[in-house]
Amino acid sequence: MRCLSKKHQKQGDEHGGEIPLPNPDEGTIICGVVRHLGGDYLIAKCLDGVDRKIRIPGKLRRKVWITEGDIILVGLWDFSSEKGEVVYKYGKNEVNKLVEKGVVPKEFIDALSELI
């Protein structure tokens, strides 16, 4: 069996094929990237309708390229619900699966594309 390099692996294979879902008990929510602010910060529109300032942590900054219009999983900070940090970036196939499961409404994806 051939071992694939990181360059050829699929993004979903990192988690064993499971897509991480939002969990309100853990303080995670799904958001869409609206714009970059610079300095590893971005503005994201979340499913609850709130615009939040999101930080990209160092472990993702070097591995994952986040652009405007991407759907991300955000962990909210305990001391400020207006800020958070990126936990996971969903790929296009994963976003389609989330829409099929009913986790993300199709209207949210359409509204996000209009904002950009």
Swiss-Prot record:
Summarizing the function annotation, the protein's role is: Seems to be required for maximal rate of protein biosynthesis. Enhances ribosome dissociation into subunits and stabilizes the binding of the initiator Met-tRNA(I) to 40 S ribosomal subunits.
Q: Which InterPro entries match?
A: NA-bd_OB-fold (IPR012340), RNA-binding_domain_S1_IF1 (IPR006196), TIF_eIF-1A (IPR001253)
Q: What is this protein called?
A: Translation initiation factor 1A
Per UniProt, the keywords (alphabetical) are: Initiation factor, Protein biosynthesis
S1-like domain location: 17-91
The cysteines covalently paired via disulfide bonds are none
Which terms does the record give in the GO molecular function aspect? RNA binding; translation initiation factor activity
UniProt keyword Protein biosynthesis present: yes
Q: Where is this region: Disordered?
A: 1-25
CDD domains reported for this sequence: S1_IF1A (cd05793)
What domain of life does the native source organism fall in? Answer: Archaea
Membrane-crossing residue ranges in chain numbering: none
Similarity field: Belongs to the eIF-1A family.
Look up and give the organism this protein is from.
Answer: Desulfurococcus amylolyticus (strain DSM 18924 / JCM 16383 / VKM B-2413 / 1221n) (Desulfurococcus kamchatkensis)
